[in-house]
Amino acid sequence: TLLASSAASDVYKRQIEDTSWIRPVKYVGVWWEMITGKSDWAYTRDVPSVQLGVTDYAATKPSGRHAANNDNVRRYIDFAAEHGFDQVLVEGWNVGWEDWFGHTKDYVFDFVTPYPDFDIAALNDYARQKGVRLMMHHETSSSVRNYERHLEAAYGLMNRYGYNAVKSGYVGDILPRGEYHYGQWMVNHYLHAVKLAAKHHIMVNAHEAVRPTGLCRTWPNLIGNESARGTEYQAFGGTKPIHVTLLPFTRLQGGPMDYTPGIFSMDVSKLNPENHSH
């Protein structure tokens, strides 16, 4: 049957012999409180235009809404440890989120510099003490060449602090202009990112990336992709009930999916009273 067939992946040759470091994980994260507007990715609202390496965040006024702060992340780590989750995804940990979207900005993130209220060493140590890990987040703002320039250093930082998985993101129009999320240039980029991640023993969960085509057989560290509407859409206008029943016969034929399950309350006003996108 179609569901039992592995034809899509069988045509690929495996490139990783020792896969003992690769395994799916269950994770929780701070993203939901951000996307609903309860909190922010950005550390401050004082800086309309960030210059990485120049902007002094210590001299700015914190907004008080930054979700990726030490105390909040520890709460998520405690929750993960108590309820059997493997990892905690922390978005908004790194500098640059103040003007990340909609500005066609090339040098938007450096993927290695944390905000002042995110102690990367202490939080990773705390997670290990609790028997869980932090999951890295690399939002690129679709500034792809910038990501590639920093990719080796970004993966090196992950190795240094004990991260073994990254959720990457490609929100917005691709830079350089003229390239598209599903074009050949971007397909080459996704492959490059996954291959380099394998060198560093890092699993990749890519969001806004091209629909998988069986490549996870060759590079099984491509542990999951988004590439379809996940659970969050149930709170953003909803999807038709048939959607989930079709996924095994369509999207999932190409490889595993990060469906972002576990969102149980679709009334987002409970998190943010000003948001009524039930």
Q: What kind of region is each of these model predictions?
A:
Residues 18, 29, 38, 52-71, ...:
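Pre-Walker A segment
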Residues 72-93, 160-164:
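Catalytic domains of carbohydrate-active enzymes, especially glycoside hydrolases
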Residues 23:
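Phosphate/adenylate-binding glycine loop and adjacent helical scaffold
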Residues 28, 80, 127:
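Conserved hydrophobic/aromatic pocket- or pore-lining residues that grip, position, or stack substrates
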